[in-house]
Each structure stands twice: as structure tokens, then as C-alpha cells.
């Protein structure tokens, strides 16, 4: 199959049996059979249509910030959008390709004195992943500012989804069920005062640095906020701060995070997540639901 791929997708950036831990925020993850970096939408469409024609599974990994890739890796094509990252500003509308860094996109908004994106100034990951998850923080979320998203269907066709049809909810969008892949997104912002925007972004950045364990690899916030509770508080009350399995630990700085402190594995993450869920449920009666996505094959 490698020779067929090299022939049919000649000139494209495709890497074979590539370890994904080189690209994930957690620094864990086994190999992808075929890791592709399309430079434009035409290349992306070629990859998807080729994979479909050969019955090869494919998926988009995004910036891999809120994902745990299992140690056995991922079969088929894994597509990363690092090279699809253009951001343009037209009046009060920002259009960003899916691979654009979300934090950098908020800085572009600030440069143009556009307000509405400040909440995301510390959220790691890509624009595509943010739309997929309806990313949010400090009272704001993508649903509040999205105009529309251009997506690639599982059949390799392009279409546009208006914000009103995204079925946004807490860390949810319709894309999670449809199988569509975000290619780009348009955001409607408002004119604002550059100094006030800067001060708000500085304030939120300070809070993030104060509360979150940014010094270690992690997948960000591990659990969704349970109704009427805070996941981190429940985990702390269960005396799980500092709990460690293998090389992965419940952060002592913020119990809602798990950090890779000693070359941990994806299995360490999974085991610790399961332990935290079970312990919190037994101590508080609250069942925690993971916010992080766990994908790929286990080595076990």
C-alpha cells in the first residue's frame, strides 16, 4: 500500500508509521500508519477521496490538544492541518482555516481592535478543534461568535454550516455526530478599545498561568463540568491531588488536570482517568464525564 500511496499522492507530505506522541500535547501516542499534512484544500480532498476509494480509514487530528492517542496508534490516514492555518480579517469578521492556532487568532483579533474573542486567549489548540468542541472559558464560548463553518463531508465534498445549525451545547457541536471535518470558520466580532481588549486578555492569561499546570505536558481540562459542581473541587475533596499512575499524575496545582511528569503512557492516562471517575463517584455520588477524547488502539 505504501507504494500505491506514494504513486497516487505523489508530491504530498505523507509520513509512514509516524509516532504521534511527537505531535500531541500529552506527549503520548503510538504510530499513525499514514500521517498527512495537506497544504491546501485540494490536497486534503485528494487524500480523503483516495482513502475512501481504497477503503482506508481516515481521521483529522487537529492540534491534538484535548486528545489522548492510545499507545497502539491509529490505523489508516491521520490528517493534520498545521499547514492549513491562514487567518484573514474582513471588517468585523475573522475567517480562520482549521489549522490556525486559536491563541494566535485571538491576538490577531486584538491587533485589529476586535472584541469578543478574549475568552479564548489561553485555550490551546486549533480553530477547527475549537469549533468541533465548542471550546470555551471564563463565560465565553465559540457558539457566541461563530457565523459559519466550512466543512468537508465524509465523502470528500465541501459544504457550509451556519452557526444556527451547529446544535451547539456544552463542549458539543453537531459535527461530533455528523463525521464532517471543519476546514475553516468565520467569526463575527465587534469593534472595541484596543487597550481594554489587551487588559482583559492579560487578566485571563494571568488567571490561567496562576491556576493551571502549564509547565508539564497535559491534555488540558480532563472532565466536563458536572451540573452544580466543579470537577476539580470534587477531585480535590476525594484527596486525589498528586495521585499518580505510571508517569501521569493528577496535578497538584489544579485537580482538573492530569500531567505527564515522567514519560507516561496513554494507558497511564486511561487508568488514572478511570480511577478518578470511580473514586469521585464513590465519595460524592457524582459521575464525572471526560471532556478529553481518547482515540486509537490500545497495546493491550
UniProtKB/Swiss-Prot annotation:
What Gene3D superfamilies is this protein classified in?
3.30.465.10, UDP-N-acetylenolpyruvoylglucosamine reductase, C-terminal domain, Uridine Diphospho-n-acetylenolpyruvylglucosamine Reductase, domain 2
Give the UniProt entry's GO cellular component terms.
cytosol
The positions flagged as active site in the entry are 171, 221, 291
- Outline the extent of the FAD-binding PCMH-type domain: 27-192
Disulfide bond sites: none
Question: What does the entry give for GO biological process?
Answer: cell division; cell wall organization; peptidoglycan biosynthetic process; regulation of cell shape
Task: Look up the record and name the cofactor or cofactors this protein needs.
Answer: FAD
Record-stated family: Belongs to the MurB family.
Q: What is the protein's known function?
A: Cell wall formation.
What's the protein here called? UDP-N-acetylenolpyruvoylglucosamine reductase
Provenance organism:
Streptococcus agalactiae serotype V (strain ATCC BAA-611 / 2603 V/R)
State which gene encodes it. murB
Amino acid at each position: 500500500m505504501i507504494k500505491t500511496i506514494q504513486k497516487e499522492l505523489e508530491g504530498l507530505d505523507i509520513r509512514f508509521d509516524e509516532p504521534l506522541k511527537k505531535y500531541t500535547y500529552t506527549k503520548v501516542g503510538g504510530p499513525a500508519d499514514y500521517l498527512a499534512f495537506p497544504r491546501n484544500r485540494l490536497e486534503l480532498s485528494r487524500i480523503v477521496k483516495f482513502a475512501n476509494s481504497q477503503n482506508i480509514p481516515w481521521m483529522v487530528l487537529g492540534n491534538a490538544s484535548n486528545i489522548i492517542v492510545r499507545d497502539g496508534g491509529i490505523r489508516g490516514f491521520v490528517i493534520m492541518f498545521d499547514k492549513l492555518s491562514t487567518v484573514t480579517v474582513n471588517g468585523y469578521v475573522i475567517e480562520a482555516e482549521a489549522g490556525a492556532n486559536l491563541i494566535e487568532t485571538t491576538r490577531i483579533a486584538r491587533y485589529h481592535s476586535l472584541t469578543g474573542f478574549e475568552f479564548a486567549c489561553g485555550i490551546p489548540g486549533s480553530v477547527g478543534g475549537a469549533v468541533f468542541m465548542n471550546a470555551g472559558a471564563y463565560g465565553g464560548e465559540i457558539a457566541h461568535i461563530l457565523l459559519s463553518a466550512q466543512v468537508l463531508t465524509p465523502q470528500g465534498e465541501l459544504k457550509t454550516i451556519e452557526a444556527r445549525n451547529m446544535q451547539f451545547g456544552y463542549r458539543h457541536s453537531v459535527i461530533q455526530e455528523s463525521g464532517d471535518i471543519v476546514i475553516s470558520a468565520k467569526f463575527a466580532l465587534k469593534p472595541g478599545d484596543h487597550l481594554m481588549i489587551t487588559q482583559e486578555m492579560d487578566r485571563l492569561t494571568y488567571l490561567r498561568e496562576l491556576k493551571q499546570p502549564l509547565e508539564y505536558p497535559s491534555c488540558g481540562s480532563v472532565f466536563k463540568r458536572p451540573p452544580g459542581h466543579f470537577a476539580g473541587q470534587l477531585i480535590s475533596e476525594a484527596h486525589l491531588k498528586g495521585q499518580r499512575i505510571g508517569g501521569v499524575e493528577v496535578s497538584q496545582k489544579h485537580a482538573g488536570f492530569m500531567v505527564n511528569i515522567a514519560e507516561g503512557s496513554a494507558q497511564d492516562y486511561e487508568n488514572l482517568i478511570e480511577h478518578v471517575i470511580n473514586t469521585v463517584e464513590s465519595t460524592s455520588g457524582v459521575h464525572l464525564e471526560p471532556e478529553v477524547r481518547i482515540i486509537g488502539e490500545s497495546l493491550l
